[in-house]
Swiss-Prot record:
Organism, scientific name: Rickettsia prowazekii (strain Madrid E)
Protein name per UniProt: Aspartate--tRNA(Asp/Asn) ligase
Subunit structure of this chain's protein: Homodimer.
Gene that this polypeptide is encoded by: aspS
SUPFAM superfamilies in alphabetical order: Class II aaRS and biotin synthetases (SSF55681), GAD domain-like (SSF55261), Nucleic acid-binding proteins (SSF50249)
Its EC number(s): 6.1.1.23
PROSITE patterns: AA_TRNA_LIGASE_II
Function: Aspartyl-tRNA synthetase with relaxed tRNA specificity since it is able to aspartylate not only its cognate tRNA(Asp) but also tRNA(Asn). Reaction proceeds in two steps: L-aspartate is first activated by ATP to form Asp-AMP and then transferred to the acceptor end of tRNA(Asp/Asn).
Molecular function per GO: aspartate-tRNA ligase activity; aspartate-tRNA(Asn) ligase activity; ATP binding; nucleic acid binding
Binding-site residues for L-aspartate, renumbered to this chain: E176, R222, H452, R497
Cellular compartment(s): Cytoplasm
Length: 605
């Protein structure tokens, strides 16, 4: 018989009754019934009940003193449970093991929090003792799910003709939109490597090198603040790139992968392929966001023309100054009490609005509310049709400059969806957002900058770039850039790449980069493109966010084995940490006087 186990704790069935077995695991629960002691023994696979009887008084006494989470090895005989003690919640619930021997392999110290229930402990304590936290069933299962998802992704990608390749972790800095994590070079004083924010240039170089379809489960590093759906520091993505493809080819490749993943690992309804395609401008108007949650049926409308000649002076004057009026319908909300409308107004004001107008249409069709008296009967009918409202509905209004109105309407739409319980249950609603602006105005400098990925191909190519002369014309340019969104969460951005040096130089020059700067930052890629670069494109769905959705986790740290906290600290390994002065000197690093003082104090030098 094996030294530690003949079976795992999820295996034993009625067919094993009468067999002598050996199990090892952790003491999950202990129940003392006087002449019987029950231990729920847990391992990676499941739980088996162990019974200690008074036929062996010493063994039963020892079992009664076992600490939770101690590791033990039990030898015994499999017996059937009586009908009244069968536990249908466990795969092993029809049997138990009558213990004949129990060896304590490793006794546990007192626990900082309870392991055997799902009551949440303080997150700081959980992260400091992550090895204990990972024993909890829900979190343990999340990590197993993550492993299964990644394994299935590999299977799906290889089956579609993709080659898995690894790209460097130590590379050069590039403008990906976030701060880099820098690594000083000992051999080259004063120079730094950067951890990759994404394998962007390398995967494009692989296409130039003739690898037709590439993928990897890529670690990416960005010095960003934490959010509920974004871990600071490190994250993983399904990075892929394809040669000789159009935008639709990318869509047709990744849609079946996502559909397969979400149908395999959940029982929820998943959007049928092809997924809905929504141009960026349409998404911003209808949903007030480029990450729309399509479970919410509310669609925003532009009703500026309805109010242009209305008797409502505030909106009419706003329109004359260039503002717009957008309507957000509230289905079947007309009969709700005044407190509901006051609550929505307070919410809008808290988000920066000056107010929130509304009209209620009763079941009989009568218009009520603060703004109803300012519209004629004909204007009200046009409003109902434009805003897609019916009798029994209410409709809210926002008037502001277009960009501000769009953002606020999006927030009001989400709030209404929650307040009115409108979100469709048990489903994953996917959509593509397409035709993103190629450029945007930098909020800090007021100058033209890339809206998203600077390596995207502008729609219309070099001709479009050369013909756009004014700022308005430049901001109207669109890119072959796309996002995949699920339930209001952006899973990935992607693009058809700019593979022509002359277009790249022109695109960067408009954004204020000289040819020398482009050569310095992207010299390897520019050089490669001069030796025959295929048209290519790609996408990189975030694995962390996919697993988060599949696990129904509310925080991304719940699907990562060893995450950083919101302050980008690893409380278990005490990272980041101070290093000795000798190590800094070897890297030619000198701290500022204030940092040096703190450093000396913490390194006891």
């Amino acid at each position: 018989m094996h030294k530690y186990r003949t079976h795992n704790c999820n295996e034993l069935q009625l067919s094993n009754v009468g067999q002598e077995v050996k199990l090892s695991g952790w003491v999950h629960r202990r129940r003392d019934h006087g002449n019987l002691v029950f231990i729920d023994l847990r391992d990676h696979y499941g739980i088996t009940q162990i019974v200690f009887t008074d036929q062996n008084q010493q063994l039963m006494y020892d079992a009664s003193r076992l600490c939770y989470e101690s590791v033990i090895t039990v030898s015994g005989t499999v017996v059937a449970r009586s009908l009244d003690t069968i536990n249908n919640k466990l795969p092993t619930g029809y049997v138990e093991v009558l213990a004949m021997e129990c060896i304590v392999e490793s006794a546990s110290s007192p626990l900082p929090f309870v392991i055997n229930n799902e009551k949440e402990a303080p997150e700081e304590s959980r992260l400091k003792h992550r090895f204990l936290d990972l024993r909890r069933e829900k979190l343990h299962n999340n990590i197993i799910l993550r492993s299964q998802v990644i394994a299935h992704i590999r299977h799906l990608m290889i089956a579609r003709g993709f080659t898995e390749l690894q790209t460097p972790i130590l590379t050069s800095s590039s403008p990906e939109g976030a701060r880099d994590f820098l690594v000083p070079s000992r051999i080259h004083p004063g120079k730094f490597y950067a951890l990759p924010q994404a394998p962007q240039q390398f995967k494009q170089l692989l296409m130039v090198a003739g690898f037709d379809r590439y993928f990897q489960i890529a670690p990416c590093f960005r010095d960003e603040d934490a959010r509920a759906d974004r871990s600071p520091g490190e994250f993983y993505q399904l990075d892929l790139e394809m040669s000789f493809v159009t935008q639709e080819d990318i869509f047709n490749t990744i849609e079946p992968v996502l559909y397969d993943l979400f149908t395999k690992f959940t029982n929820k309804t998943v959007s049928n392929t092809p997924f809905v395609r929504i141009p960026y401008n349409e998404s911003m108007l209808k949903y007030g966001s480029d990450k729309p949650d399509l479970r919410n049926p509310i669609i925003i409308s532009d009703v500026t023309e309805v109010f242009r000649d209305s008797n409502f002076t505030i909106f009419r004057e706003n329109i004359k100054k260039g503002s717009v009026v957008h309507a957000i319908p509230a289905p079947q909300a007309a009969s709700l009490p005044r407190s509901f409308f006051d609550k929505m107004i307070e919410f809008a004001i808290s988000k920066g609005a000056r107010g929130l107008g509304y009209i209620q249409f009763s079941e009989s069709g009568e218009a009520k509310g603060p703004l109803s008296k300012f519209l004629t009967g004909q204007q009200l009918e046009i409003l109902k049709a434009t805003a897609n409202t019916s009798n029994g509905d209410a409709v809210f209004f926002v008037s502001d400059k277009k960009d501000e109105a769009v953002k606020l309407c999006g927030k009001v739409r989400i709030k209404l969806g929650e307040e009115l319980n409108l979100l469709e249950k048990d489903c994953f609603k996917f959509c593509w957002i397409t035709d993103f602006p190629f450029y945007e105005l930098n909020e800090e400098t007021g100058k033209i900058d890339f809206s998203h990925n600077p390596f995207s191909m502008p729609q219309g190519g070099i001709d479009a770039l050369e013909q756009a002369k004014t700022t308005e014309e430049l901001l109207a340019l669109t890119a072959y850039q796309y996002d995949i969104v699920c339930n209001g969460i952006e899973l990935s951005s992607g693009a058809i790449r700019n593979h022509k040096p002359e277009i790249m130089y022109k695109a960067f020059s408009i954004a204020g980069y000289s040819a020398e700067e482009v050569e310095q930052r992207f010299g390897a890629m520019i050089k490669a493109f001069r030796f025959g670069a295929p048209p290519h494109g790609g996408i990189a769905p975030g694995i962390d966010r996919i697993v988060m959705l599949l696990a129904e986790a509310t925080n991304i740290r719940e699907i990562i084995a060893f995450p950083l906290n919101q302050q980008a600290e690893d409380l278990l390994m005490n990272a980041p940490s101070y290093v000795e002065e000798k190590a800094l000197k070897e890297l030619s690093i000198m701290l500022s006087p204030s940092s040096r003082k703190i450093h000396k104090k913490n390194t006891n030098l």
